[in-house]
Amino acid sequence: MKTLLLSPVVVTIVCLDLGYTMTCCNQQSSQPKTTTNCAGNSCYKKTWSDHRGTIIERGCGCPQVKSGIKLECCHTNECNN
């Protein structure tokens, strides 16, 4: 009888994604799109210019940046493309 009572609980746990992850883009500048799974709930896109031109860095989280660097943080899958 205990086995029958535990079966729905096990099925529920297996079907739910208890460790939610986000998918963030992580390609640099104009490279082909690549993604990574992130444990947090945000993605970022940093943009700045130097002697090479406009540089774009993408990844997980929402880091602190120096002045002169544009930072966009977002909270949906692949929102930083």
UniProtKB/Swiss-Prot annotation:
**Keyword hit for Secreted:** yes
Matching CDD domains, A to Z? TFP_snake_toxin
Question: What main location does UniProt list?
Answer: secreted
Q: In which tissues is it expressed?
A: Expressed by the venom gland.
Q: Disulfide connectivity? A: 24-43, 38-60, 62-73, 74-79
Any idea which UniProt keywords this protein has?
Acetylcholine receptor inhibiting toxin, Disulfide bond, Ion channel impairing toxin, Neurotoxin, Postsynaptic neurotoxin, Secreted, Signal, Toxin
Would you indicate the residue range of the signal peptide? 1-21
Q: Output a single Gene Ontology CC term carried by this record.
A: extracellular region
Which PROSITE patterns does its entry note?
A: SNAKE_TOXIN (PS00272)
- Give one GO term, molecular function aspect: ion channel regulator activity
> What's the protein name?
Short neurotoxin 1
Q: Which organism is it from?
A: Hydrophis peronii (Spiny-headed seasnake)
What are the leading ranks of the lineage?
Eukaryota, Metazoa, Chordata, Craniata, Vertebrata
